[in-house]
Amino acid sequence: MKNEKRKTGIEPKVFFPPLIIVGILCWLTVRDLDAANVVINAVFSYVTNVWGWAFEWYMVVMLFGWFWLVFGPYAKKRLGNEPPEFSTASWIFMMFASCTSAAVLFWGSIEIYYYISTPPFGLEPNSTGAKELGLAYSLFHWGPLPWATYSFLSVAFAYFFFVRKMEVIRPSSTLVPLVGEKHAKGLFGTIVDNFYLVALIFAMGTSLGLATPLVTECMQWLFGIPHTLQLDAIIITCWIILNAICVACGLQKGVRIASDVRSYLSFLMLGWVFIVSGASFIMNYFTDSVGMLLMYLPRMLFYTDPIAKGGFPQGWTVFYWAWWVIYAIQMSIFLARISRGRTVRELCFGMVLGLTASTWILWTVLGSNTLLLMDKNIINIPNLIEQYGVARAIIETWAALPLSTATMWGFFILCFIATVTLVNACSYTLAMSTCREVRDGEEPPLLVRIGWSILVGIIGIVLLALGGLKPIQTAIIAGGCPLFFVNIMVTLSFIKDAKQNWKD
């Protein structure tokens, strides 16, 4: 019994440091919100202006790595000896499901407004040129380039899982080929794992901070309940309690069903928006935006704006590249696990084509709808943001559609389910990563899962208390900095080990 308790207990060296670090940062922030905002602005400015170029080069180098995998010596190598675990259709559907989070619904609905009102390349705000580039930039930030970087890491993790038969729940275990077993399991590996966990906690808290206001604004629209910070906190608390009940009562099957419902409802809601908002315009705008993307792609890839200093690449491109970096390990582990039995080329092409199609559909439909509503003066997004906040502006883009009550109910259910599954996934991932020798498929301890969901909820509330998007953007960028190096080390470790052990 003692051995079993030890086996399923927490791993102190990766449990307590992230808990203490995040706890102290939350306490300091709540203690003085104004001072915290000053620090946040300073951190954001320093990282994006001084080191933004590094994130851009990281994405470009990883893109070349994708081409090397697709056309290089490992292209036909199979990730495991078994046939593919899922059919190609199911595999692609599972990829799409991973893209339909509430945070994605947040950015997909409002991102184009920011690109048009504060455009790149010195364009006039709200001009024709700004509108032509609006969706093109969304397709750039959520298109083949970032998914290609995830492909490389997914191949790396799939190689360690299915070829080398390694149990990987933290990144340090993949670094043995690069730094040796002594360092990977010693202080160096512990530091790497703690960087990963702190960044992941902030990323998940950020996603919760984006998702919660959408649900509470829906509640205000549907039920007339005023949206306040207290309501946000109550809703987050309810999600944590619901997650605890699901885990304690063995309702994980219900959570998985909810995840499937989320995916199907996403298809339904996107189809509805596509039909009623203007299918012809959406297809024309998408086609034109692909052309604009191809025309401006070299500039977008390397745009740092050092002369004009307009701030667009720092505020958006660097932010989004940090977003992709911070979620890379967690997402790549998931994508690797569902790709057993596929070749390297299949995985790389499947991810880039399938996931790009998913994100492009989301951003095209939601972004085009927002642009149409702005052009027709149906909603005034600047006034809505100034008076009520970003979440209200997003809600109004949905409420302006025909059959508004039914549409809002659909959006409310979608956001609620998406956030329930988010909290569940957060608690599971963090508990798995901070427990001792919990194997894949096993359940980590209940109290550990509840504890992490509470901490993630607290971070979400703190970010909401700070107000605005800058704290959320800064949390992502600050967390992305250490993972920038961790991702590179995982990649190099895979290349070194594959060169030695993955021969014909």
UniProtKB/Swiss-Prot annotation:
<keyword id="KW-1133">Transmembrane helix</keyword>
<feature type="transmembrane region" description="Helical">
    <location>
        <begin position="398"/>
        <end position="418"/>
    </location>
</feature>
<dbReference type="InterPro" id="IPR000060">
    <property type="entry name" value="BCCT_transptr"/>
</dbReference>
<dbReference type="GO" id="GO:0005886">
    <property type="term" value="C:plasma membrane"/>
</dbReference>
<dbReference type="InterPro" id="IPR018093">
    <property type="entry name" value="BCCT_CS"/>
</dbReference>
<feature type="transmembrane region" description="Helical">
    <location>
        <begin position="347"/>
        <end position="367"/>
    </location>
</feature>
<keyword id="KW-0813">Transport</keyword>
<protein>
    <recommendedName>
        <fullName>L-carnitine/gamma-butyrobetaine antiporter</fullName>
    </recommendedName>
</protein>
<feature type="transmembrane region" description="Helical">
    <location>
        <begin position="195"/>
        <end position="215"/>
    </location>
</feature>
<keyword id="KW-0050">Antiport</keyword>
<comment type="pathway">
    <text>Amine and polyamine metabolism; carnitine metabolism.</text>
</comment>
<comment type="subunit">
    <text>Homotrimer.</text>
</comment>
<dbReference type="GO" id="GO:1900751">
    <property type="term" value="P:4-(trimethylammonio)butanoate transport"/>
</dbReference>
<comment type="function">
    <text>Catalyzes the exchange of L-carnitine for gamma-butyrobetaine.</text>
</comment>
<feature type="transmembrane region" description="Helical">
    <location>
        <begin position="51"/>
        <end position="71"/>
    </location>
</feature>
<keyword id="KW-1003">Cell membrane</keyword>
<keyword id="KW-0997">Cell inner membrane</keyword>
<dbReference type="InterPro" id="IPR023449">
    <property type="entry name" value="BCCT_transptr_CaiT"/>
</dbReference>
<comment type="similarity">
    <text>Belongs to the BCCT transporter (TC 2.A.15) family. CaiT subfamily.</text>
</comment>
<feature type="transmembrane region" description="Helical">
    <location>
        <begin position="231"/>
        <end position="251"/>
    </location>
</feature>
<feature type="transmembrane region" description="Helical">
    <location>
        <begin position="446"/>
        <end position="466"/>
    </location>
</feature>
<keyword id="KW-0472">Membrane</keyword>
<feature type="transmembrane region" description="Helical">
    <location>
        <begin position="10"/>
        <end position="30"/>
    </location>
</feature>
<feature type="transmembrane region" description="Helical">
    <location>
        <begin position="316"/>
        <end position="336"/>
    </location>
</feature>
<keyword id="KW-0812">Transmembrane</keyword>
<feature type="transmembrane region" description="Helical">
    <location>
        <begin position="263"/>
        <end position="283"/>
    </location>
</feature>
<feature type="transmembrane region" description="Helical">
    <location>
        <begin position="475"/>
        <end position="495"/>
    </location>
</feature>
<dbReference type="GO" id="GO:0044667">
    <property type="term" value="F:(R)-carnitine:4-(trimethylammonio)butanoate antiporter activity"/>
</dbReference>
<dbReference type="Pfam" id="PF02028">
    <property type="entry name" value="BCCT"/>
</dbReference>
<feature type="transmembrane region" description="Helical">
    <location>
        <begin position="143"/>
        <end position="163"/>
    </location>
</feature>
<feature type="transmembrane region" description="Helical">
    <location>
        <begin position="92"/>
        <end position="112"/>
    </location>
</feature>
<dbReference type="GO" id="GO:0009437">
    <property type="term" value="P:carnitine metabolic process"/>
</dbReference>
